[in-house]
Design a protein with these regions (language model features):
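Surface-exposed patches in mature extracellular/periplasmic domains of secreted proteins
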Residues: 78-85, 141-146, 166-170, 250-257, ...
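Detector for the c-type heme attachment site
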Residues: 91-100, 158, 201-208, 221, ...
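Post-cleavage N-terminal segment of exported redox proteins
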Residues: 2-70, 76, 115-188, 297-314
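C-terminal cap of thioredoxin/glutaredoxin-like
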Residues: 189, 196, 200-201, 206-208, ...
Length: 314
């Protein structure tokens, strides 16, 4: 039995299954992805860091926990099913199993906590940060502190960060800064970018693509995607991620304006309710989404986003 493959492998396989000729045409027209050294240089000015290869995972009890953490990253609905409420996996936002610079890599996150977070206005441990990912990005519920799921993810993150000094400035942490758009992000322009660059993998209605019930390309909106409380619910965060990582394997092929526009388009669609629901869209926006980068509680194409009632119990 083989474990779930990496996103790149899945992407190549799925493109062959779904649209081989279209994929070939797209690849022929697309600019080549920059080499990894250039990608790293583009996402920070600190020291370069390369996490250890999978072959270096120790063959002992600790190594087993590291491998479980890796597997949770790659197929979260399978290996952490009790805490997941959608079809996303951690690797959808932390590419290359949490290794990729400029894609919020786990090795950079691990050495950055404990840290104060404005999102919940308190100092968070690394485990608490992971809990938030399950609650918002996975639209599920937080695994208990000390649970096997969190211990496995923490072990994997620790192992990836071996050799990286704590709190040292390092290239590739988080998502790269993105220049402010020359024009205000726009739904219509974003839709054009989506149809030209994203629809092949993520489908016409953002529902993603599946093979034998398994997610191959993640849903970007709708009931199976992240909820309104997730970091990607800020189109500024989404734009930074998209610019550095999408289309998959073609980092930095979009212009900054295109990244802003398509992020706006993505976030201008409905998705599961913010679990911090305050009883009304207006109250929830006032407390948690009072930002020009959140479309929650605003009207887009005549639809009040977030007006879907209370969140479903988890």
């Amino acid at each position: 039995m083989t474990r779930k493959q990496t996103p790149m492998t899945l992407a190549l396989c799925a493109l062959g299954l779904f649209a081989a000729s279209a994929a070939s045409a797209l690849a022929a027209d697309a600019p080549m992805a920059p080499p990894k050294s250039e990608i790293n240089a583009a996402v920070g000015t600190g020291a370069q860091f390369t996490p250890p290869p999978e072959s270096a995972i120790p063959d002992d009890d600790f190594g087993k926990m590291v491998k479980l953490g890796r597997d949770i990253m790659l197929d979260t609905p399978k290996y952490a099913k009790d805490f997941v409420g959608n079809t996303l996996s951690c690797v959808n936002c932390h590419t290359d199993a949490g290794r990729m610079a400029g894609s919020a890599p786990l090795w950079a996150a691990y050495v950055s906590y404990p840290a104060y977070r404005g999102k919940n206005k308190k100092v968070n441990t690394f485990e608490e940060r992971l809990q938030g990912c399950f609650k918002f990005s996975q639209n599920g519920k937080a695994p208990p502190l000390g649970s096997k799921t969190l211990v496995a993810l923490e072990s994997y993150s620790y192992w990836l960060s071996k050799g990286l000094p704590v709190d040292e400035k390092v290239a590739g942490r988080g998502y790269p800064n993105l220049p402010e758009p020359q024009q205000a992000p726009d739904y219509v322009r974003g839709q054009k970018v989506y149809e030209a660059k994203c629809i092949l993998c993520h489908a016409a209605n953002g529902e993603g693509q599946y093979v034998n019930g398994e997610t191959v390309f993640p849903p970007l909106w709708g009931p199976k995607s992240f909820n309104w409380g997730a970091g990607m619910g800020s189109y500024k965060n989404a734009a930074k991620f998209i610019y550095a990582n999408m289309p998959y394997g073609m980092s930095y092929s979009l212009s900054p304006q295109e990244a802003w526009d398509v992020a706006y388009f993505m976030d201008a669609h409905e998705r599961p309710q913010d679990p911090r629901w305050q009883g009304s869209v207006a109250a929830t926006r006032a407390k948690f989404h009072d930002s020009k980068f959140s479309l929650y509680g605003t009207k887009v194409n005549g639809k009040l986003l977030g007006d879907i009632g209370a969140p479903k119990p988890r």
